[in-house]
A protein has these predicted regions:
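Phosphate-binding site of ATP-dependent enzymes
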Residues: 235-313
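ATP-grasp fold ATP-binding core
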Residues: 185, 211-231, 252-261
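Hydrophobic beta-strand scaffold residues
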Residues: 61, 163-164, 192, 218, ...
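Short hydrophobic transmembrane-like helices used for membrane targeting/insertion
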Residues: 1-2, 8
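ATP-binding N-terminal substructure of ATP-dependent carboxylate-amine bond-forming enzymes
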Residues: 8-165, 169-170, 174-180, 187, ...
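Basic phosphate/pyrophosphate-binding loop/patch that engages nucleotide-derived ligands
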Residues: 184-191, 246
Length: 313
């Protein structure tokens, strides 16, 4: 059963929130966090930060949480519970379903029938949850890694006819794939590390031959993962099997790369008005200063021994 928002008996919590959403003239922006990914925890921090940063004088943020198992919920609780990964325990999560109608441009929210005004429900409708349509004007997928940065969620919302803030399907899928990204960069004359890609089931002998041709030390990485998950700097032949096993925990493909001595810089580039030929906004170049090792998960999110210089030195 699908009912309009007006059928809800507004008594605070989620329902006051839905009432606010219904009556607002502001663009409704769904902010996705969590996700079926090894980078779930990272996304909780990022998603909470984005929700707090949105100018609520201009936009109505709609928190949409995705569990580790891939279940979608409208979340109506406190943002602190997101960061602490208690958002699913709050009792303020309501299942989300998708409409096959592009003109709906939004979600169907499953609301317990007990929360509806009795005059809106017939006797045979009171036993089951009801679906409430909720349209949104855009989605910010603050998701990391698999099913978030790889073009999959971008494709989902393209099918639903809902604009997505950030990279599109093609750029997301290509940039998440280290092998394909290397091939494209190399074809444009950009230098990339010498590398070798392998699938699960590759023989140990073939791996050793590939590594020997690259030389030690080298890196072993999952092809499609972020936040430095599954990456090992291999110093010699004896460390290779464990590094390969670790990388295969995160993807069915791995890439073995030569180690290049140097330093890392980053630069954000943003397009404008969905026009590929339009003006680009180019951010300041930053530099990562390491005291030891490489920029792994711990250093990326705690900066225990690393520093980031903006602008680069």
């Amino acid at each position: 059963m699908i009912l309009p928002l007006t059928a809800i008996n507004y008594q605070g919590g989620l329902y006051m929130k839905l009432s606010d959403i219904q009556n607002t003239n502001l663009p409704r922006i769904a902010v996705l966090f969590g996700g079926n990914s090894s980078e779930y925890q990272v996304s909780l921090s990022s998603g909470s930060a984005v929700l707090r940063a949105i100018d609520t004088g201009k936009y109505m943020p709609i928190p949409v949480g995705i569990s580790k198992e891939g279940r979608w919920f409208l979340y109506a609780g406190d943002y602190d519970a997101i960061t602490a990964d208690r958002w699913q325990e709050s009792g303020k999560c309501f299942p989300i379903y998708f409409s096959g109608d592009q003109s709906a441009q939004g979600f169907l929210i499953s609301i317990p029938s007990s929360e509806f005004s009795s005059n809106e429900l017939s006797s045979d409708e009171t036993a089951s949850p009801s679906l409430v349509p909720l349209s949104v004007q855009a989605v910010i997928p603050v998701l990391h890694g698999k099913n978030g940065e790889d073009g999959t969620v971008q494709g989902l919302f393209a099918l639903l006819g809902i604009p997505v803030i950030g990279c599109g399907i093609l750029s997301s899928s290509l940039c998440m794939d280290k092998e394909r990204a290397h091939q494209i960069a190399s074809s444009l004359g950009i230098s990339v590390p010498a590398s070798f890609c392998a699938y699960e089931g590759i023989s140990e002998d073939e791996l050793y031959r590939a590594a020997d041709s690259l030389g030690y030390p080298l890196f072993v990485k999952p092809v499609r993962a972020g936040s430095s998950f599954g990456i090992t700097c291999v110093q010699d032949k004896s460390q290779l099997p464990a590094a390969v096993k670790e990388a295969f925990l995160y993807d069915t493909r791995i890439i073995i790369e030569e180690k290049i001595e140097g330093f890392e810089v980053g630069c954000a580039v943003m397009g404008r008005n969905f026009n590929p030929a339009g003006e680009l906004t180019i951010g300041e170049v930053d530099e990562i200063e390491l005291t030891d090792g490489f920029f792994d998960y711990t250093e990326k999110y705690t900066l225990k021994t690393s520093k980031i210089h903006v602008p680069a030195r």
